[in-house]
Structure formats: C-alpha cells, structure tokens
Amino acid sequence: MENIIARRYAKAIASRADINDFYQNLCILNSAFVLPKFKNIIESNEIKKERKMEFLDSFFHIKNSSFQNFLRLLIENSRLECIPQIVKELERQKAFKENIFVGIVHSKEKLSQENLKDLEVKLNKKFNANIKLNNKISQDDSVKIELEELGYELSFSMKALQNKLNEYVLKII
C-alpha cells in the first residue's frame, strides 16, 4: 500500500520543474530515517503536527515554500513514514526519465571496475540506454545480472553447465 502512495507522490514531484530541489530535500530527510529517535518522533501520535513541521523545518537552511507545503500535506495525511519509499520511487522515475538504469551483478568474487565497465558498455548497446552496474558478492558459483527496471535477468551457473556437458556426453555414448 505504501508503495502505491509513494508512487503517486513521486509522480507528482517528477512532473515539477524543481524536482531536483525536492529530491535533495527528501534525501536529507531520508538519511535521518536510520535514527530510531527520528522515527519515533515522526511516528508519534503524541507530538502535535505543528511541532513535527517545526522539527522537519529545522533540517533546512533555505526554506522552500513548495516543499514546506508538501511536508504539511504528508503530516496532515500521516504519511511522513512514506518518505523513504518516495525517495526510492523518485530515484527510479528520475532514472527512467534520464534513460539511466541501475543493475546488479551477483558473483562469487568481486569484479574489477574494468569488467563492470565492459559489461556496462555491452548492455548499453543492447538496450540503447545508460546502464550502471554494481557488484554484489554471493555464495553460489553462478554469475547473475539483474536489471529490474528493464525486466532483464541473465544468469550463468557452473553447475548447470556441468550438468549439460554430462547430458551431452551421455547422449554421445
């Protein structure tokens, strides 16, 4: 449910001319969500809405009236806890708008930057988009490339290759 709500807010922000200002401000608030005290204040029903607004305003040196109105809207609708999802969805929409997609390469060993760049170049050509890859270490012997936004997943497993080779050898015999 929160993802649907976050998607609507992010879509509205993405259509604004000052999307970057909103995004930067939301990132500031999003970074505070790792603090348990911050989350307690945001989620508390005992703290008045005006005090929450003052608290959130204290994070910013330059006041943006549009952003303040947005925060008031979130406070009124008790949706401040949706900020991390809004940031994530806004990042996704910005990337889609700029034709930039982030993918993950799962591998047993850390890949060199050169290998990642080589994969990025090949995927850029295949999808005609700007692909950025991150390496994630996994325990299995397979290599897997995930581009969630494009609905693309490629995996290569040594076990599967060995099984197919065994089947092929058995067929020949």
UniProtKB/Swiss-Prot annotation:
The keyword Iron does not apply. Its main location: membrane. Gene3D superfamilies: N-terminal domain of the delta subunit of the F1F0-ATP synthase (1.10.520.20). It is a peripheral membrane protein. SUPFAM superfamilies: N-terminal domain of the delta subunit of the F1F0-ATP synthase (SSF47928). GO terms for cellular component: plasma membrane; proton-transporting ATP synthase complex. It comes from the Bacteria. One of its GO terms (molecular function) is proton-transporting ATP synthase activity, rotational mechanism. It is found in: Cell inner membrane. Keywords: ATP synthesis, Cell inner membrane, Cell membrane, CF(1), Hydrogen ion transport, Ion transport, Membrane, Transport. F(1)F(0) ATP synthase produces ATP from ADP in the presence of a proton or sodium gradient. F-type ATPases consist of two structural domains, F(1) containing the extramembraneous catalytic core and F(0) containing the membrane proton channel, linked together by a central stalk and a peripheral stalk. During catalysis, ATP synthesis in the catalytic domain of F(1) is coupled via a rotary mechanism of the central stalk subunits to proton translocation. Belongs to the ATPase delta chain family. F-type ATPases have 2 components, F(1) - the catalytic core - and F(0) - the membrane proton channel. F(1) has five subunits: alpha(3), beta(3), gamma(1), delta(1), epsilon(1). F(0) has three main subunits: a(1), b(2) and c(10-14). The alpha and beta chains form an alternating ring which encloses part of the gamma chain. F(1) is attached to F(0) by a central stalk formed by the gamma and epsilon chains, while a peripheral stalk is formed by the delta and b chains. This is ATP synthase subunit delta.
